[in-house]
Amino acid sequence: MKRKKLVIGSILMGMTLSLSACGSSDNIVTTKSGSISESDFNKKLKENYGKQNLSEMVVEKVLHDKYKVTDEEVTKQLEELKDKMGDNFNTYMESNGVKNEDQLKEKLKLTFAFEKAIKATVTEKDIKDHYKPKLQVSHILVKDEKTAKEIKEKLNSGEDFAALAKQYSEDPGSKEKGGELSEFGPGMMVKEFEDAAYKLEVGQLSEPVKSSFGYHIIKLTDKKELKPYEEEKENIRKELEQQRIQDPQFHQQVTRDLLKNADIKVSDKDLKDTFKELEK
């Protein structure tokens, strides 16, 4: 079982600050320099954390309403977590900011609900768009286009790809392996690299491809056999779900979409513009 992340992006932090300005004048701290009342304390909390905490509470409310998580699911996950962590279970809870199993169950429940929200975004079109064979490639990565073109000329004149990769490549993970990368499928590489790789035939070299890492020269060494769509459909769905679950930017988009569709109305004047960003 993979270790569940208990924090899904900054907007779902497990903060439990009380924001109720109850108007009490009871002091919660006294010093030689003066005292701090409960109402002053709550006012300060509201000023500093009110909007963030309100956002989190609304997201939790929407998630639990739209994506039901059963007690059985949570209990099963908790027991698996206990088995995995063993004697380190209590340390694990402390490191994740929870004091007891009930709090942990609530966090697991929220995590499950958010994962269900993410999984629901995978459509039939997404699956069909990713129905492509997995590729095996080697590449040479350099910082500038001039060097990339010079290396391509050497390759065109018959020089060995692996030898040039060991000499020039600035990718530490593949350099000593002659530029060889692990097998990959759709959505696993930066777009520019992936698009170029899927256009190649086995044995073919790409022109220099610019990405955020630099300039790549790609060699397609193998294209795996593609199984029938119906056999691969569920595997592709699961891969897409896991990619999105692990993508913080996708978390933000899902959260934004949940809030935009929640018909939120804020009556508190101090928190009125909490969801103003959703209007853009």
From Swiss-Prot:
Membrane topology: Lipid-anchor
EC number: 5.2.1.8
Covalent lipidation (N-palmitoyl cysteine), chain numbering: C22
InterPro entries reported for this sequence: Foldase_PrsA, PPIase_dom_sf, PPIase_PpiC, PPIase_PpiC_CS, PrsA_foldase, Trigger_fact/SurA_dom_sf
Residues with lipid group (S-diacylglycerol cysteine): C22
PROSITE patterns in alphabetical order: PPIC_PPIASE_1, PPIC_PPIASE_2, PROKAR_LIPOPROTEIN
Any one GO biological process: protein folding
Catalyzed chemical reaction(s): [protein]-peptidylproline (omega=180) = [protein]-peptidylproline (omega=0)
Pfam families: Rotamase_3
GO CC entries: plasma membrane
Location of the protein in the cell: Cell membrane
The UniProt record lists the keyword Ribosomal protein: no
Family (UniProt): Belongs to the PrsA family.
Protein name from the UniProt record: Foldase protein PrsA 4
Species, as recorded: Bacillus cereus (strain ATCC 14579 / DSM 31 / CCUG 7414 / JCM 2152 / NBRC 15305 / NCIMB 9373 / NCTC 2599 / NRRL B-3711)
Taxonomic lineage from the root: Bacteria, Bacillati, Bacillota, Bacilli, Bacillales
Gene name for this UniProt entry: prsA4
